């Protein structure tokens, strides 16, 4: 009996030891490899990049997409740590493993700083690299210290220097649209980066990462030889996880997730795709999954909004207000690359910020017209973004509690009980304090658009064109198509009459689903639905 107990303990222990360790929050290549954590092999990209024609490269990707890990991987590679790359693609590609001195600068801690703080921080991170190579320097200007550091390391080692700069734009993101602060901080960063051009004879490779694209003139006015690979097809999969990598390098993880959720492998893959896939970083990019959400999903054995929850996009919501972006306009749009792959500090529309931050992505490309189709990447982004926007239309805590009402509405609509769903919404809105922007019909249209969009799994559109006019809201579910017309301070019968008089239903006659017409009337004094009428076509 004792032997059985010991045997059982050993089995349990082996199972615990065999549990895969995910690199959640770990950005150090050395640590991931020595601790036997999961590493998705990106070393073929490392070899390709470091043996390309350009020695100065910039890569832009959204936050938590693996940029810092890529920088750390480059550092280990250039420092000749061959043992860390055992079993990876680069082990067979690289023959020489030449060791180079590496200067690694992370700007991640340079956020939310005033001018003097930023200058001190730059001197601090330069000092860390000086200490690494036993160099002393008391110059007070960061650009002078950087130039001296590069030249002294070159002389001391007899080898060209590698410079890796992670999150180059971190000090500027929060002030990107504050003209006074941006100008001061931008000048500091421009001066800091300026030695990179004059030090070219001493440099083997320079690599910079960031989220946003600042104009060449504003930051790198002296450095005009940077190659931007952010939209290069060859490097579209350098960060994030491709579908091929998911199905091959994480195949066991998919099976474990499916088993945990009581579903098939195929269903698990579809759920992963719907929630975390959908990113494309070039015209011919393969599907890219969000790595942070994917790892968390496998680690927790459950689907969640991990990436969105890891960083509230306050600055993004503020910029949407500044540019008067309506929720219904977020989604499918057509644009030339100059409209989204563009510097953000002087943007006249919010598209570049949405794209570069990961809230919009490339969905299609027409080679003849060079026209891109952009859209929200996946369910996680759609739900997270609209939940963040809901407080603009509902007050404080009531917006936060709205998710329960919305979930209940979703159940009722699936059961073909739109009347019950609208009753539930009316009751909920009755608990929301009066909002002083409720005297415009468009306010209610946007509010309903957000709420219907959060039902998930349904297609929602506003201002849909028909031969006789525009429909306020169209909601397409698995079993019905709803035509919804809104009125303010009038009556639901008037709204329904407009649907019938203008024969809106004819526009959707070939949709293959029963059509339901709904007239809804809001009362601006109550900020709530006053009445509605539902009629089958």
What spans do the regions from the language model cover?
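Metal-dependent nuclease catalytic cores in nucleic-acid-processing enzymes
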Residues: 192-199, 352-360, 449-453, 498-518
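Conserved catalytic cores of phosphodiester-cleaving nucleases, focusing on short active-site segments
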Residues: 448, 471-488, 502
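Active-site metal-binding core of divalent-cation-utilizing nuclease and nuclease-like domains
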Residues: 153-157, 451-478
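Domain-level recognition of nuclease-like catalytic cores that cleave nucleotide substrates
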Residues: 507, 511-537
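Structural motif
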Residues: 162, 480-482, 516
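Mg2+/Mn2+-dependent nuclease catalytic core
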Residues: 182-188, 488-505
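Phosphate-binding site recognition
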Residues: 2-440, 455-456
